[in-house]
Amino acid sequence: VYARYMEAFAGFLDYTDEQIGRVIDYLEEIRELDNTIVVFLSDNGASAEGGQDGHFNTCKSFDIFSPSDDLEVSLEHLEDIGSEYAFNHYPLGWANLGNVPFPWYKTWAYSGGVKDPLIIRYPKAIKDAGTIRSQYEHVIDITPTILDLLEIEKPAHIKGVIQKEMHGK
C-alpha cells in the first residue's frame, strides 16, 4: 500500500514534468524561450497530511464524523489510488524522504516545511545559469523583481481597484 501511494505521487511528478517540457519545447519552437521568464516554485515542503498509513480520501481526514481511513480501505482500493476515484495522500514516511536532507515537513515552520525549491530561468538577466544558490527567497520578492526586469511600474489601480503597496524588493 505504501509503495502504491508513492507510485501514484511519482506518476503525478512525471506527468507534471512532461507538461512543463511541452511548454518549454513550444517556447523553443517559436523562438521565445530566451525571451520568457520561467518561474517554477513550490509553496511548501513535502506534506505529512497522509498520517502514518496514508489516506485513500484525504477529505475524510477533515471529516470528524466519519472514521478515518485505514490500511484495509487502502488495500481494498489499491488499484484506484492515483486515479480519478481517489483523493489520496501518501504516508508521512514518504514526506520525510521527500524533504531530505531537511527534517520535518509542511505544517511545521522547520527546514523541511519551508525550504522549498525556486527555479527561475531568464538568460537576459541571469548570467550564471545553472548556479545553485543557498540564500533565502520569499514569494513577495518575485513580482517586484519581475516588474524591475521588465522595466514596468507597479500599477496604482487595476480595474478600478487601488493596489496596496508591495512589500518585497
Regions found by a protein language model. Give the residues of each.
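Beta-rich accessory regions
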Residues: 27, 31, 56-60, 153
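An alpha-helix initiation/capping motif
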Residues: 14, 35, 39-42, 140, ...
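Substrate-binding rim/cap in mid-to-C-terminal beta-strand-loop elements of soluble/periplasmic
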Residues: 3, 25, 64-169
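Short secondary-structure boundary/capping segments
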Residues: 46, 51-65, 161
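The substrate-binding groove and active-site-proximal loops of carbohydrate-active enzymes
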Residues: 3-15
